[in-house]
Amino acid sequence: LPYRERKVKILNGLHTMSVLAGYNAGFKIVRDMINDKAFKAYIDKGLNEEIIKTIDLDENELKAFANSVIERFNNPFIDHKLLDISLNSVAKFKARCLCSLLDYYNKFGKIPSVLSFSFAALINFYENFENKDYPVNDVESVLHFFKTKHNDIVFDVLANVGFWGEDLTKIDGLYKKVKAYFDDIKSLGISKAMEKLLDE
C-alpha cells in the first residue's frame, strides 16, 4: 500500500527523524526546529535524497506531500512539543525510519546519511538518560536496556534483536556510519555534528 507507506515514511518518519536531535540541540517545539536553517537543510536532505527515493510513487507527488507536511510543522497556531513526540521513540524509529533506511540500503547498496545520523541521535537521546535533565518515556524493556552499562552502546543498540527484529550490525557499513555520527555528536554537539553531515 504505497499511500500508507507514504504517510508512515514521510509524515511520521519526519517527526521521528528530527525531534530527538532537535531537542538535544536546544529546541522545544517543532516550529522552532523547522525554522532553523541547518535543521531545515537536514530535513530536506533526509526527505528528498533518502526517504522519497524508497517509495514507489511519483516523485513530484511525493515532494508535494512532503512540502504539505513541512507546512503543517510550521503552523503558527500549534505548538508541537518535541518531548511529547519523543514518547516510545525506539518502536517509532523501527516502524517509521528503519524501514526507509533498510529499503534505501537494499535499493542502492549503501547506507543513507541522514537516517543514520537520526539513529545516532536516538541513541544519544536515550543513553545515560537517568543523568539527564529531561524525561525519557518508553516501555520498561527499553528503559532497562539503556540503564544497563554498555562498553559500546552503538553496537549493543544495533545488535538488539528485541528492538529491531533483526541484528542490524550485520548490515554492511551501518554500525560504522552510526558510530561515526554518534562520536561526532558526543565530541561536537548535535548542531556542529549536523553541519558536518550537511557538508559531506
Kindly give the residue locations of the regions a language model identified.
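Non-transmembrane, aqueous-exposed alpha-helical and coiled segments at domain scale
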Residues: L1-E200
